[in-house]
Structures are given as C-alpha cells and as structure tokens.
C-alpha cells in the first residue's frame, strides 16, 4: 500500500504583519501542521519544534495531497521565500525535485483545469477558496478562517489552532477522496473536471 498523506499548515504570523506579505513564506513560521495518514488512519500534529520531523515525513511519503500546498505550505515548511521557491533556485530546486512527483495539490489542479498557469497568479484565478469548493462539492464547510489562526497562536490558543488545522485537513482528505473517485469538483456552480496530474 502506498504511503498517501494529506497535509495542512497554519502559520505563526499574519500576512499583514509580515514584511513581504504572501511572498515572505520564509518568515511566516509553522504554528501547527496536521498530517492525515491513510495507512494508519491517524492524524499527526506537528508544532514549531517538530518542523524537521514534518519535513522528513513529507519526503518519505509516496503521495502528498492538500490545498495550495505547492505554493504555500511547502515553502512555509521549508522556510523558503515564495519567489525563491517559484524560481527553483538554491536549496528549493532539490526539495522541489523530491516533492513534485508526489504532490497532489487540489488548487493547482483547479487552476490548470481552468487553463491558468498555476505558477503565475492572476486575477481570474480567484474564487477557488477551499470553503467554496468543498462546500459545493462534498457539502463540507470550514469551521473558521485561516487568517485567524496566527492571531489565535499569538494569543496562546494553540489548541484552537490545532482544531482548526485538523478540521481543514479532514476536509482536504474528503475532497481528495471525492476527486480520486469521481474526477471533478464543483466550481462556480459547474462541474470542473480535473487533470490526473499537475
């Protein structure tokens, strides 16, 4: 049986308080990461002190599913700025070579199915939030907003961040299962058929 996992990350610092904003994935920090393991049917939780173990877990997996993991979660986990990650320079080139063949990023697949280049964000790519896609496709809604997670973390409400992250991970797992079985998501009221691989 292949080692398939689902990963979701919550950050320590808000985008607004971080110089460089969304591009500064190297400065956001891992507050909590949750990994659902299909083989064990268990959720594993990683904190800021467990980042190296989290990296090793991802590199050991055969398939990694998630939502916007390629452009966000992975660079945050490895502490690499988004521009460096996207350019594939330095350390990121080796990491990307290891992760790319096993990466099942649902958001990238949605963008590709719409004819967008998933590595170049443009205005038309909006409207594909996890809450909207999961709500329309599998009837699952998020229990909060990702922008709140770093605020909770800074307030010391770590269990609240864990609960939120674990819930997102379960939604991403269930959405992955649906896509693997049926091959599409509901996006803007219509079936959107996804490519097998991004």
Tell where the protein language model's regions lie, with residue ranges:
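A short secondary-structure junction signal
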Residues: 18, 76-77, 129, 145-146, ...
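Conserved DEDDh/DEDDy metal-dependent 3′-5′ exonuclease domain
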Residues: 38-129
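Acidic active-site catalytic centers that drive phospho-/nucleotidyl reactions
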Residues: 8-10, 105, 168
């Amino acid at each position: 049986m292949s080692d398939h996992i689902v990963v979701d990350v919550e950050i320590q610092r808000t985008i607004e308080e971080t110089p460089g904003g969304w591009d500064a994935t190297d400065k956001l920090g891992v507050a909590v990461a949750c990994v659902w393991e299909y083989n064990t049917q268990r959720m594993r939780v990683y904190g800021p002190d467990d980042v190296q173990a989290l990296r090793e877990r991802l590199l050991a997996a055969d398939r990694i599913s998630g939502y916007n993991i390629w452009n966000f979660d992975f660079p945050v986990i490895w502490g690499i700025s988004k521009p460096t990650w996207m350019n594939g320079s330095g350390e990121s080139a080796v990491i990307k070579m290891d992760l790319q063949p096993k990466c099942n990023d649902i958001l990238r697949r949605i963008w590709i199915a719409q004819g967008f280049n998933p590595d170049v964000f443009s205005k038309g790519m909006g409207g594909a939030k996890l809450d909207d896609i999961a709500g329309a496709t599998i009837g699952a809604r998020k229990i909060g907003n990702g922008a709140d997670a770093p605020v909770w973390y800074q307030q010391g409400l770590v269990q609240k961040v864990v609960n939120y992250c674990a819930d997102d991970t379960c939604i991403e797992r269930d959405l992955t299962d649906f896509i693997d079985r049926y091959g599409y998501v509901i996006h803007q009221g219509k079936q959107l058929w996804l490519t097998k691989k991004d």
